[in-house]
Amino acid sequence: MTDAKMKKKRTTPFLYLASIVFLPWWISLFFKKSLESWVTNWLNISQSEPFLNDIQEKSLIEKFIELEELLLLDEMIKECPKLDLQKFRIGIHKETIQLMNMYNDDRIHTILHFSTNIISFVILSVCSILGNEELVILNSWIKEFLYNLSDTLKAFCLLALTDFLFGFHTISAWELLIGSVVHNDQMRSLLVCLFPSVLHTIYYFWTFNYLNCVSPSLVVLYDSLVDVD
């Protein structure tokens, strides 16, 4: 009975870790599929006119003007003796509907992403509150693992993590990650420039604070590895 309890005590933190990693993703994916049809119907029924912010409205007007010019140019290239205004208006109307549908789909995806992010945050918060004992066990295991590493290996792991998160080759990964949450081009470009830099500064501050607490010699070793890199 004692062995069974000890085995259960060892496996419970791993099950808890797997649940906080995969459970929010599974549930948010389920809610996203369930909410998609409801959000689409709500937007189509409750909103008689599309709601656009200033940036979206400006972008839509620019695309509409560009579309109008392209259709007019297409009619001129055909060398028609007389421009068919009725056909031209029909073409403009069809393309305008497509543009509005595109912006409507963008709004739907924005609402779904925001909703699923809130759901994931709530699930993680509940798991953190209910699994306080498992968190303590995991924290003790991580501290013991880090304590048993040599100073050189600790510095190497920190340097590898720094390069993995903030290296010059990670720009595309940050663009993909931020683009999956933020769909506005201007906001995405701003966050791609600012977010990694701010996170990098916080990470460096935490790293040197941690190294000073663990072993001051690690700071010198880490600095030397950074200079070599």
From Swiss-Prot:
Membrane-spanning ranges: 11-31, 118-138, 158-178, 190-210
Pfam family, one: CemA
Subcellular location: Plastid, Chloroplast inner membrane
Membrane topology: Multi-pass membrane protein
Any one Gene Ontology BP term: potassium ion transport
Main location: plastid
Reaction(s) this enzyme catalyzes, per UniProt: K(+)(in) + H(+)(out) = K(+)(out) + H(+)(in)
Protein family: Belongs to the CemA family.
Protein name (database record): Potassium/proton antiporter CemA
Lineage per the UniProt record: Eukaryota, Viridiplantae, Streptophyta, Embryophyta, Tracheophyta
